[in-house]
Design a protein with these regions (language model features):
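Helix-adjacent hinge/juxtasegments
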Residues: 55-96
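Amphipathic, well-packed alpha-helical segments that form the structural scaffold of globular domains
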Residues: 20, 24, 86-89
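Short, contiguous alpha-helical
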Residues: 5, 9-23, 30-68, 100-158
Length: 158
């Protein structure tokens, strides 16, 4: 595996780690939360992240396709998010060629997913379900670990 593809896999694992932190322990009611009453709720944002990951996989396979999925019930949307991460990482881990460049996948879908994970973390605080901050440079993020179960935080703070 070349260095660029390996770095993309590490980034996908980072999305899983940070995304896991953003969704873990969130109440089911968080799915419908929007600070200003707009239709862009936490559940719709997470559904969009799942769509981004599906899009990244379709780009990698050379059959680029976009889906605008309606949000599922919160726990099902969380499962969908991690399932999409797993499918994308499995493809990246394989010997299958990438139909587009690593840079294109990163600058679009993956970077956008990271942005939206940050939005979910901010919405948690606004919704009164805040999560602790963390020094992510010390986090035990490992290539291939893309499920909900992640290692415990090494250095958290309020």
């Amino acid at each position: 595996m070349d260095d660029k593809r390996a770095l993309l896999r590490h980034t996908v694992a980072t999305v899983a780690y940070r995304g896991g932190k953003a969704v873990r322990g969130a109440p089911a009611s968080f799915a419908g939360y929007s600070p200003d009453g707009s239709p862009r709720t936490a559940g719709k944002i997470l559904a969009h992240v799942g769509d981004l990951l599906d899009w990244a996989l379709s780009q990698a396979k050379g059959a680029e396709a976009w889906t605008d999925s309606p949000p599922l019930q919160w726990d099902l949307e969380v499962e969908r998010f991690f399932g999409a991460l797993q499918r994308f990482d499995d493809y990246l881990a394989s010997d299958a060629p990438l139909a587009v460049s690593v840079e294109r996948i990163f600058q679009g879908a993956v970077a956008d997913a990271l942005t939206h994970i940050g939005q979910l973390a901010m919405l948690r605080r606004l919704a009164g379900a805040k999560m602790k901050g963390e020094n992510y440079s010390r986090a035990d993020i490992a290539v291939g670990r893309v499920g909900l179960e992640q290692t415990s935080a090494k250095r958290e703070f309020d």
